[in-house]
């Protein structure tokens, strides 16, 4: 147990009630940061917001229906750097609870149906591999076919995934 956790437990303060802003070092009530969509009220620093949390922020509660969750990354090149890509994918899936960096689907905003896609930087920095590209392509095609407004939110910072070579670059 960390010293901070021990101090918190001794004071009776629940874990996650407060967070420290890395932008200004202000201690912020987590609920306040959440109400500000992940921003610090003092300096406007933007905290990490997960893809699932972003869905909750954007769509009407309980309306999201995920598309193409069964698409899974493969390792066609059997790529290995410090770790085999196949092992990296499994560890990222276990760590994040995501199958890949993109989440796509449909939901409602003020009772209007929309198509929504987003990337989550927690999964290999939100980098684009073949699954990300395929999910976004299918999202765009379905939104067009169904005449739905399309919203894509990039939580990415990773670029194309080198582990998949040309397959990620073709996206």
What are these regions, as identified by a protein language model?
Residues 1-171:
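Terminal-region recognition feature
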């Amino acid at each position: 147990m960390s010293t901070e956790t021990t101090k918190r437990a001794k004071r009776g303060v629940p874990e996650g009630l407060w967070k420290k802003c890395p932008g200004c070092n202000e201690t912020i009530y987590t609920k306040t940061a959440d109400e500000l969509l992940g921003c610090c009220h003092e300096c406007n620093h933007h905290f990490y917001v997960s893809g699932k949390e972003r869905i909750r922020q954007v769509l009407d509660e309980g309306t999201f229906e995920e598309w193409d969750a069964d698409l899974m990354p493969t390792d066609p090149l059997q790529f290995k750097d410090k770790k085999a890509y196949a092992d990296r994918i499994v560890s990222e899936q276990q760590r994040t609870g995501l199958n890949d960096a993109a989440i796509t689907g449909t939901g409602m905003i003020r009772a209007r149906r929309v198509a929504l896609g987003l990337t989550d930087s927690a999964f290999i920095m939100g980098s684009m591999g073949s699954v990300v590209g395929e999910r976004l392509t299918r999202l765009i095609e379905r939104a067009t076919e169904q005449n739905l407004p399309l919203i894509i939110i990039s939580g990415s910072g990773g670029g194309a995934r080198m582990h998949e070579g040309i397959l990620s670059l073709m996206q």
